[in-house]
Amino acid sequence: MYTILLIGIGGFIGAVLRYSLSGWVQNSFVNFPLGTLVVNIVGSFFLGLVMYLSEYQGLFSEETRILLTIGLLGAFTTLSTFSYESFRLLESSKLMQLTMNIVATVLFSIFAVYLGKISALNLAAYLRGIK
């Protein structure tokens, strides 16, 4: 029950953050789903960061990792919105924007996880040097 509560709290925070950031970014870009793209890239970075700090550096407890990854980041990032927005671009025959959206989301999200990993390793090395 405690784990479900942690996921729910994290999910609430992640959903509110996603709504806020995505809406703020999207206000400037009407014809391209930049808000969702930014949210997915930022979320991928933080997922990489948290997972590497947690799994390989032992920096977070299992409860904190669950709250941050399954709860907060699970609600923050969204494949369903990406899929819907991509389909709408296809439906509108905006094939160039569709291609850009798919390629940018996949490549930048994977790269963001990599940057999260590198950041986690650097942070862990820095923290070990402080001790």
UniProtKB/Swiss-Prot annotation:
It catalyses: fluoride(in) = fluoride(out). It comes from the Archaea. The keyword Transmembrane applies. Its main location: membrane. Na(+) binds at G74, T77. It is a multi-pass membrane protein. The keyword NAD does not apply. InterPro entries: FluC. GO terms for biological process: cellular detoxification of fluoride; fluoride transmembrane transport. Na(+) is not transported, but it plays an essential structural role and its presence is essential for fluoride channel function. Belongs to the fluoride channel Fluc/FEX (TC 1.A.43) family. This is Fluoride-specific ion channel FluC 1. It comes from Methanosarcina acetivorans (strain ATCC 35395 / DSM 2834 / JCM 12185 / C2A). The gene is fluC1.
